[in-house]
């Protein structure tokens, strides 16, 4: 009999809480922004549970209700900012009260309160953010270019020798992962079979599943966390504890080994070594916190860059004219005697346009980032209560027909006259002229924008310079149409699809071979102390 009552408890507790809230209702709530009507008790929970549909739905709601609208999930309020001006006025100009995070019990437990992206706005968040800024500012980010140059040369060689038309999906992830691991820890990830690569994939998979909107009931109804037995809510605590244990063991093993190497004087040059030497002395933080701070770079640098690069390839297959446009520009500016370099960027507006258009066309996540208010506020006559989740609705902004002609079409020429970097575009006075919002807004904007910009540019420029790209064919010669669906989880990473890469000429293929051979002989020029972790060495680093 007692067991039979368990399913009733969550509903009963929720109803009691709702009755209490209605009894003490704030009259200012009459001035909430307009929005779609929800169901009793659960509000818009069912509408928002399917993240794949939310991309279109959030745009449709913005069209119907305007630049700011309201949804509700259980007792939790969300306000969606669907215009550049609304984002600027609230997230940018009022960052002191629009920079926290909505309550997310699952995400918090998976991270044990250590992941920077999900920390509430406060002293701990500011301390870690300031430490990371030293590694991610414009000047410091430029010192990482030798790493990105080296890894992109290997990626070209890997694609040239790929065993099938699917392998590029993983090659792009290896490139992204090895780049950010070298920057962060001074450890390369040279192969897809490398133990460290498998460890990072494990963490990325946990992170993506834990943060998938609508995946965890407890994150949609946080007030049930300490009320309802977890076995009625997907055993979320057990899952979160298991994932945190695995993730923290990997991160702490990497961190502790580097600290030991620093003491012995054998540590490679990397961001974390500099952080330990300088910033941690001034702002001491716990080892676990430092390890997860480094992990924040790895998760973002691996996941988001992979997503963008695979979306570039998808765009090539859906809109083959962009390949022709890129080839024409590269042949004119670079020629066939060498591959593109960072110094070519000012003369490659079409390539820059491909990078920017990719991030507008398919932003990195299925739903824009949610901040949270720490005080009551008003905007254009609308009341925004303290504790409200405030979503940067980038799908409404990026797909706005008034700003972008045929917005669902991939068109790099939109940016041919745009000479600003993403960081410069974020800071310009007129928010309506910003290139895209994929790097966020306000005090929680992406601190790695400079590294991301460089990683995308050099890879995109060289991939287009080196290869023709076509839709693959099956054994009968039938063309295989690529899927536009996304993988499960928070990110808008496309499901794996085939693409046929072919070197543009024997000369291009020879240059790829020669440059990669030279790169291996030379090492990463300008990256002193770099070492490549061997499988044997990494077994001492890996937790498993």
Curated annotation (Swiss-Prot):
Induction / repression: Expression is regulated by the cluster-specific regulator verZ.
Recorded GO MF terms: heme binding; iron ion binding; monooxygenase activity; oxidoreductase activity, acting on paired donors, with incorporation or reduction of molecular oxygen
Phenotype reported upon loss of the gene: Completely abolishes the 11'-deoxyverticillin A production.
Pathway: Mycotoxin biosynthesis
Residue positions binding heme: 446
Broad enzyme group: oxidoreductase
Entry keywords, A to Z: Heme, Iron, Membrane, Metal-binding, Monooxygenase, Oxidoreductase, Transmembrane, Transmembrane helix
Subcellular location: Membrane
Disulfide bonds: none
EC assignment: 1.-.-.-
Positions of region (Disordered): 520-544
Any one GO CC term of the record: membrane
InterPro entries per UniProt: Cyt_P450, Cyt_P450_CS, Cyt_P450_E_grp-I, Cyt_P450_sf, Cytochrome_P450_fung
Domain of life: Eukaryota
Pfam families in the record: p450
UniProt entry tagged with the keyword Lipoprotein: no
Record carries keyword Hydrolase: no
PROSITE patterns the record matches: CYTOCHROME_P450 (PS00086)
Family in the record: Belongs to the cytochrome P450 family.
Summary of the function given for this chain in its UniProt record: Cytochrome P450 monooxygenase; part of the gene cluster that mediates the biosynthesis of 11'-deoxyverticillin A, one of the dimeric epipolythiodioxopiperazines (ETPs) from the verticillin family that act as mycotoxins. 11'-deoxyverticillin A is required for normal conidiation. The nonribosomal peptide synthetase verP is speculated to be responsible for condensation of amino acids to form the carbon skeleton of verticillin, whereas the cluster-specific tailoring enzymes are involved in further modifications leading to the production of 11'-deoxyverticillin A.
Protein name: Cytochrome P450 monooxygenase verL
Species assigned in the record: Clonostachys rogersoniana
């Amino acid at each position: 009999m007692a067991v039979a009552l368990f399913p009733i408890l969550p509903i009963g507790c929720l109803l009691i809480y709702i009755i209490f809230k209605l009894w003490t209702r704030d009259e200012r709530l009459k001035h909430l922004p307009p929005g779609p009507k929800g169901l009793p008790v659960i509000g818009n929970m069912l509408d928002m549970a399917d993240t794949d549909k939310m991309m279109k739905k959030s745009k449709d709601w913005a069209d119907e209700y305007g630049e700011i609208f309201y949804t509700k999930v259980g007792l939790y309020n969300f306000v969606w900012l669907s215009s550049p001006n609304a984002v600027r006025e609230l997230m940018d100009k009022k960052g002191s009260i629009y920079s926290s995070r909505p309550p997310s019990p699952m995400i918090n437990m998976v991270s044990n309160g250590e992941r920077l992206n999900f920390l509430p706005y406060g002293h701990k968040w500011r301390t870690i953010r300031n430490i990371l800024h030293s590694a991610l500012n414009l000047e410091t980010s430029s010192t990482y270019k030798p790493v990105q140059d080296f890894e992109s040369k290997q990626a070209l060689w890997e694609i040239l020798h790929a065993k099938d038309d699917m392998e590029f999906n993983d090659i792009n992830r290896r490139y992204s992962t090895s780049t950010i691991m070298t920057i962060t820890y001074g450890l390369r990830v040279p192969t897809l079979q490398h133990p460290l690569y498998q460890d990072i994939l494990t963490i990325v998979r946990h992170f993506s599943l834990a943060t998938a909107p609508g995946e965890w009931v407890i994150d949609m109804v946080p007030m049930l966390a300490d009320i309802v037995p977890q076995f009625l809510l997907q055993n979320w605590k057990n899952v979160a504890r298991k994932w945190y244990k695995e993730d923290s063991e990997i991160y702490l093993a990497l961190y502790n080994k580097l600290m030991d190497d620093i003491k012995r004087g054998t540590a490679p040059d990397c961001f974390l070594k500099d952080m330990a030497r300088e910033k941690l002395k001034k702002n001491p933080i716990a080892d676990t916190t430092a390890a997860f701070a480094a992990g924040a770079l790895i998760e973002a640098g691996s996941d988001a860059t992979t997503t963008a690069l695979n979306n570039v390839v998808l765009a090539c297959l859906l809109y083959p004219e962009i390949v022709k446009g890129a080839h024409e520009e590269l042949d004119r500016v670079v020629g066939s005697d060498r591959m593109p370099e960072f110094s070519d960027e000012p003369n490659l507006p079409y390539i820059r346009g491909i990078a920017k258009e990719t991030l507008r066309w398919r932003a990195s996540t299925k739903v824009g980032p949610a901040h949270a208010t720490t005080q009551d506020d008003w905007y254009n006559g609308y009341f925004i209560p303290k504790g409200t989740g405030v979503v940067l609705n980038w799908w409404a902004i990026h797909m706005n027909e008034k700003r972008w002609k045929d917005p669902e079409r991939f068109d790099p020429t939109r940016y041919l006259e745009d000479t600003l970097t993403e960081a410069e575009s974020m800071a310009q006075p007129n928010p309506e002229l910003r290139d895209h919002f994929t790097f966020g807004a306000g005090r929680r904007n992406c601190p790695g924008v400079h590294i991301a910009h460089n990683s995308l540019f050099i890879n995109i420029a060289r991939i287009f310079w080196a290869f023709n790209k076509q839709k693959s064919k099956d054994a009968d010669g039938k063309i295989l149409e690529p899927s536009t669906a996304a993988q499960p989880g928070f990110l808008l990473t496309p499901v794996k699809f085939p693409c046929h890469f072919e070197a543009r000429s024997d000369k291009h293929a020879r240059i790829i071979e020669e440059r990669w051979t030279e790169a291996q002989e030379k090492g990463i020029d300008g990256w002193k102390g770099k070492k490549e972790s061997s499988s044997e060495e990494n077994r001492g680093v890996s937790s498993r």
